[in-house]
Amino acid sequence: MVHMSAEEKGIVTSMWGKVNVDDIGAEALGRLLVVYPWTQRFFDSFGDLSSPAAIMGNPKVKAHGKKVAHSISDGIKNLDNLKGTYAKLSELHCDKLHVDPENFRLLGNVLVCVLARNLGKEFTPHARTAFQKMVLEVAAALAHKYH
């Protein structure tokens, strides 16, 4: 596990408050499905995922991306208790959905890229480091039931 300093937690909380969470989530999930097409197998019920344009315009991808981003918001509000915050989601993804936990790390990396694109120069190297630590912590919490 990585350790986030109080300063890094503050950076994550502050910068997350500057983005449109719904848009960030939709873009991040869409990009995950485009860049890592094997992740599409978990979203068979989402309809047309045949091309990048179809994925990025898919209303079910956008809706689920929003849901994912709001879950990230919950984690950011509870950075000191991520395992507890994500316990039920970890169990769902492990026991019922059988999602490879590596996908959580991939989504976190995509999220960091989307944040960088949306925040521009404000997304400094220090901010990137703070968010990278946060997404690694979230991925570990989501993978907790797998161990």
UniProtKB/Swiss-Prot annotation:
Keywords: Acetylation, Heme, Iron, Metal-binding, Oxygen transport, Phosphoprotein, S-nitrosylation, Transport. The modification N6-acetyllysine is found at residues 60, 83, 145. Residues 3-147 form the Globin domain. GO terms for molecular function: haptoglobin binding; heme binding; hemoglobin alpha binding; metal ion binding; organic acid binding; oxygen binding; oxygen carrier activity; peroxidase activity. Pfam families: Globin. The modification Phosphothreonine is found at residue 13. The modification N-acetylvaline is found at residue 2. The keyword Acetylation applies. The keyword Metal-binding applies. CDD domains: Hb-beta-like. SUPFAM superfamilies: Globin-like (SSF46458). The modification S-nitrosocysteine is found at residue 94. One of its GO terms (biological process) is hydrogen peroxide catabolic process. Red blood cells. Heme b binds at residues 64, 93. InterPro entries: Globin (IPR000971), Globin-like_sf (IPR009050), Globin/Proto (IPR012292), Hemoglobin_b (IPR002337), Hemoglobin_oxygen_transport (IPR050056). Heterotetramer of two alpha chains and two beta chains. Belongs to the globin family. Involved in oxygen transport from the lung to the various peripheral tissues. This is Hemoglobin subunit beta. The lineage of its organism: Eukaryota, Metazoa, Chordata, Craniata, Vertebrata. The gene is HBB.
